[in-house]
């Protein structure tokens, strides 16, 4: 069913969704929304869950492109990207190296710091860590999170040294590597990008200032402000910073950087997401809409940029 127009342009498309990571539930929502939009636009798109089918059969079944709507390990960390490279099936988003690097919050911060880009101070935690020394180095509060998880999985805000070990234990259930990060007080922002263009800044106001997994995906109480209300010059500076941060990691196609902005106007890069959510609560579609791209147009733009290498 190649058809004409859009269908012929993209060929047979696999929307990769679900997977086996801790973010499976969100990925199913993201992939379902993308799949519906592509099909409505006339694309010969099919849902494909790597947790239920072997990805090698994508080639056997004649797929021409893959839209990666997987989140977390196994989908956002370079592994799926590497397999698609071997199968020679062009895919959306960043390549193998950038996907793996951005998924690793520790090494992402090392690259940004080496490039002179602002990111909060940090330390790696282990069972034998001197908790008091970490507090002396980073101050309080401290944000503790797994190095390789997204959607705030296993993350804890620590307000006393006595809480650090429990926070480490919680994060360590998700990952062998656990990051302690200086807690930055200020406005929580996110800046998506599409191709070489930064989209509008979004300001996030979560209930109680807690933008966790629940408040990201399953509540209507979190407020997302787009336009952000920032002065135009400041917004442009933040967009430029995000594009620098993406280029430093080798990101391409689309993505989203999370950052904090202090009261005196200093930005701090937190994380880079190379396969952001595409749910009803997601932020890339919101920013795209602000510049005239509806959800379907956004999905088509991302798919059009699918490539190898």
Swiss-Prot record:
It comes from Aromatoleum aromaticum (strain DSM 19018 / LMG 30748 / EbN1). Binds 2 magnesium or manganese ions per subunit. Residues 109-304 form the ATP-grasp domain. Its cofactor is Mg(2+); Mn(2+). Mg(2+) 2 binds at residues 271, 273. Mg(2+) 1 binds at residues 258, 271. SUPFAM superfamilies: Glutathione synthetase ATP-binding domain-like (SSF56059), PreATP-grasp domain (SSF52440). It is an enzyme of class 6 (ligase). Its EC number is 6.3.2.4. Pathway: Cell wall biogenesis; peptidoglycan biosynthesis. Keywords: ATP-binding, Cell shape, Cell wall biogenesis/degradation, Cytoplasm, Ligase, Magnesium, Manganese, Metal-binding, Nucleotide-binding, Peptidoglycan synthesis. Belongs to the D-alanine--D-alanine ligase family. Cell wall formation. GO terms for molecular function: ATP binding; D-alanine-D-alanine ligase activity; metal ion binding. PROSITE patterns: ATP_GRASP, DALA_DALA_LIGASE_1, DALA_DALA_LIGASE_2. It is found in: Cytoplasm. InterPro entries: ATP-grasp, ATP_grasp_subdomain_1, D-Ala_lig_Van_CS, D_ala_D_ala, Dala_Dala_lig_C, Dala_Dala_lig_N, PreATP-grasp_dom_sf. ATP binds at residues 135-190. This is D-alanine--D-alanine ligase. The keyword Signal does not apply. One of its GO terms (cellular component) is cytosol. One of its GO terms (biological process) is regulation of cell shape. It catalyses: 2 D-alanine + ATP = D-alanyl-D-alanine + ADP + phosphate + H(+). The gene is ddl.
């Amino acid at each position: 069913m190649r058809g004409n127009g859009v269908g012929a342009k993209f060929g047979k498309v696999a929307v990769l969704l679900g997977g086996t990571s801790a973010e499976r539930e969100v990925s199913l929502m993201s992939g379902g929304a993308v799949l519906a939009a592509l099909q409505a636009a006339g694309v010969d798109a099919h849902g494909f869950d790597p947790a239920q089918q072997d990805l090698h059969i994508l080639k056997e079944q004649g797929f021409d492109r893959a839209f990666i709507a997987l989140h977390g390990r196994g989908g956002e960390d370079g592994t799926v990207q590497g397999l698609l490279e071997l199968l020679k099936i062009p895919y959306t988003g960043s390549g193998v190296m950038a996907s793996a690097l951005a998924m690793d919050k520790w090494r992402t911060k090392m690259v940004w710091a080496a490039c002179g880009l602002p990111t909060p101070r940090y330390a790696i935690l282990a069972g034998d860590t001197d908790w008091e020394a970490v507090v002396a180095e980073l101050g309080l509060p401290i944000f503790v999170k797994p190095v390789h998880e997204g959607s705030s999985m296993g993350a804890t805000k620590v307000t006393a040294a006595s809480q650090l070990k429990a926070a480490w234990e919680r994060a360590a259930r998700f990952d062998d590597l656990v990051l302690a990060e200086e807690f930055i007080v200020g406005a929580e922002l996110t800046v998506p990008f599409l191709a070489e263009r930064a989209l509008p800044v979004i300001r996030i106001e979560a209930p109680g200032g807690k933008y966790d997994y629940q408040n990201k995906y399953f509540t209507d109480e979190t407020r997302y402000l787009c336009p952000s209300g920032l002065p135009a010059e400041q917004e442009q500076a933040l967009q430029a910073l995000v594009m620098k941060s993406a280029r430093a990691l080798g990101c391409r196609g689309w993505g989203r950087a999370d950052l904090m902005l202090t009261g005196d106007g200093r930005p701090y890069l937190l994380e880079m997401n190379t396969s952001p959510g595409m749910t009803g609560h997601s932020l890339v579609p919101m920013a795209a809409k602000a510049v005239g791209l509806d959800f379907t147009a956004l999905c088509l733009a991302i798919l059009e940029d699918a490539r190898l290498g």
